[in-house]
Amino acid sequence: MKNFFSYDPKLLVYGFLIVFFASYGQTFFISLFNTEIRFYYGLTDGEFGFVYAISTLFSSFILISFAKLIDHIDLRTYSLIVTVGLLLACIGMALLINNIFYLFIIIFMLRFFGQGAMTHAGETTMARYFGSNRGKALSVATLGGMAGVMFLPYISLNYFINIEMKQLWFYASISIIVFIPFIFLALSGQKARHNKFDQGLINDPLNLKLRTRDIIKDKKFYIYLPLSIAAPFISTGLMFHQIYIFSHKGWSLEMLGNGYILLGFFSIVGLLIGGPLIDKFHTKKTAITVLGPLLLSVIVLLLFDSVFFLFIYMSLYGLNMGI
């Protein structure tokens, strides 16, 4: 483990930070403002959900083509593009205007640059440059996302509860501006790092570059596809409507913020379990395990209203996110 952290510590910092700041485009953060956004635009839960779903689907389709850039341009350039994109999206939220098309564009940018491109950059970088330790490296990057899950809702709901939504998004913009210089500090020596990676491609079949058409023709792709989309599909729905769900069950927003601390903790537990499992048994033997905690969390949410089960739900949900 010591050799792992000393191999390329700056790149690990990059993976952690870029996935952490991608949190601003994640459903768990955006949904904290669900009520304010709906009130501002006069939308029902279903109408805002429709706008959010279309924006997310559109961003995912565009990402399929856009994400290829990371294979063809310098990682520093790619990272700067996607980070500035998220910065503009946060500024757009801070300057929100009452136009439904404007809302669609801003949600699209948050989802595309945050949830999509920045997370993709962090995870791809970890998997690419750490070879047989890619599982542990991916855990470090994912830990950045878990830190966002743990602290951003807690801070927002406990310390900024009386601050207007637009002002909070302005603060988010400032934090991204502060983050941008760290991209270049963490990615110093990137040219030499990538040259070393290219040299190892011939001897490492795990790093084989595949075209999209090759993946689509592979039967294993269609076996793993349901497993890959089930967890995020269900999780996004739960997160997006979390304010409504908690209100319906009589759970306060402060409880939600505190619950995220527990969610983040068990996400880390899941990471500590999942990373070594991937390195030892590989993905094909561990993929199915991610659905177990999620299934249990949904059952708990469906059957129980006690505050005690709120924390059971958040714990199981966090374990699912980590694994």
Residues of each region from the PLM?
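C-terminal ends and interior cores of transmembrane alpha-helices
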Residues: 84-98, 293-305
